[in-house]
Amino acid sequence: MTRPQYYRIKLKRIPGKYRSYQPLPVTRYSPSKLRKQVEAFAIYFKREFDYAIREFDAREKDPYTAYLFPDPHANVWIGACCFRPESYAYDVDSETLRWIWLHPYHRMKGVLTEAWPFFRASHGDFFVEPPLSLGMLHFVLRHNRGSRFFGYYEKLAGQSQLGFVNGISKAEH
């Protein structure tokens, strides 16, 4: 795979029966085509943030609820996120938003802001698992003031102002 192909983002058309203005829930029982689309966004997430592991596999059997974000005007999927019953690395007794990826064009355009109340209603006071980009940290601080995890996010924000995010200096990113 050439370098330009490695970084190419392909947005797939939304099949007619799944067209909506709301994020589409995807579970381990959903059609393979939907699970594979979530997996594709997990691969983009891995590449963008230079992670060693992929956060989602379409074949996995552990419980999760992922969501595909639609662009209803263009009828394409523009991103995904995944909730799990627990955190991978943190000792919290809560559902956890383990990862989220949106196409760069659609970031900061209200997609997540619009979906957030739905996520809170569906998953309660969930934990947003670090590491968080500075943009995501800012979003979480703005939209989770009533969360029992708010103090933790404030602590992360303090570290980021000192040049650290999750214990890693910005220079190391």
Tell me what each language-model feature is:
Residues 109-114:
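A short glycine-leucine-enriched loop at secondary-structure breakpoints
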Residues 1-106, 117-127, 132-137, 142-146, ...:
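Non-catalytic substrate-recognition and accessory regions of acyl/acetyltransferase enzymes
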